[in-house]
Amino acid sequence: MSADGRSGRLRFTKMHGAGNDFVVLDLRDGTPPPDAALAAQLADRHFGIGCDQILTIEAPRSEGAAAAYGIWNSDGSAARQCGNGARCVAAWLVRDGTAQGERFIIDSPATAHAVERLDGDRYAVAMGVPQFEPTQIPLAGFAHARDEYALPVHGETVRFGAVSMGNPHAVVEVGRVDAAPVERVGALLQQNAAFPDSVNVGFAQVVDPVHVRLRVFERGVGETLACGSGACAAAAVLMQRGRVERDVQVSLPGGELRIRWPGDQEQVVMSGPAVFVFDGEWNR
C-alpha cells in the first residue's frame, strides 16, 4: 500500500532519470491522487521530500498495459508527458513484479508507451510520433508547420522550432548551451500568448551530427537536470532540419540520453537510465 489513512503516512520511492528526480507513489490501493497543494508540498525541497515531478502508479487504461501513471509538476500542476518519468515508472514496475518480461506497455496521460529493458539500469521507451502542426502543439498565430518560427518577445526576436511529443516544446538552437539565456527566454516564451498551454523550452547546441548538448526550462518546474521529452523534441526538430543524424546522443546537465527517430511517420525512441535512490515514508 502507498498510504496508511489512520497514521497519515505516505509511502514513496525516490528515483531519478539522468538527474531529473521523482517521488513515486503507488495509488493502486485506492489512495486518491494528490491535489495541487499536496503535490507542491511533496515536491518542495525544503519542507517536503523534494523532486521535479510526482509520479503516481495507477491501474492500466489501455488493453495489455502493465499499469498507468500520472504526472504532477513541482508547482502542483498536472502534466501529460514525461520521458524520464516513463523510464522510472518502468523500472519501478519491474522491481515491484507488475511488469514481466523484457518488453511491456505503460500508459502515460498522453498515450501508451512500449518499453524495453536494456542492460543495467537502462530502459528504452517509444515516445510517439512527433507532431509539428501548430494546432497539435498548440502554437497560435501560425497556420502551417515551419522549420523555424519567430516571435517578438520583449523587444527581441526569438527563433525556435516547435513540436509536440504529447506535450508542447519550443527548441531554440544556440551556439553555446552553457551561455544560453535559459531562465529568461524560457520564462518569456512560456508566458507568451502564442503558447496557450505554455511550453517546455529547450536550448540545443549541435556538437556534431551525432551529438547534441541540451538544457530545458520545463513548464511548471523551471530548469531541470534532464528532460526526456525535451531531448526527443530537440532531436526531432534538429533531425527535421537536417542538422543531425537520425540516431543521436543528447547530453544534458544530469546525464546522457540516446534518441532515435528512424523515419518521419515512426515513433521516437528514447534510451537512458532509471535509478532508485531510496524508499521512505512521509508523515503528513
UniProtKB/Swiss-Prot annotation:
Pathway the protein acts in: Amino-acid biosynthesis; L-lysine biosynthesis via DAP pathway; DL-2,6-diaminopimelate from LL-2,6-diaminopimelate: step 1/1
Transmembrane segments: none
Residue positions binding substrate: 20, 53, 73, 83-84, 167, 200, 218-219, 228-229
Swiss-Prot/TrEMBL catalytic activity: (2S,6S)-2,6-diaminopimelate = meso-2,6-diaminopimelate
Record flagged with keyword Isomerase: yes
EC number(s) on file: 5.1.1.7
Keyword Cytoplasm annotated: yes
Keyword annotations from UniProtKB, A to Z: Amino-acid biosynthesis, Cytoplasm, Isomerase, Lysine biosynthesis
Function text: Catalyzes the stereoinversion of LL-2,6-diaminopimelate (L,L-DAP) to meso-diaminopimelate (meso-DAP), a precursor of L-lysine and an essential component of the bacterial peptidoglycan.
Family recorded in the similarity comment: Belongs to the diaminopimelate epimerase family.
Protein name stated in the entry: Diaminopimelate epimerase
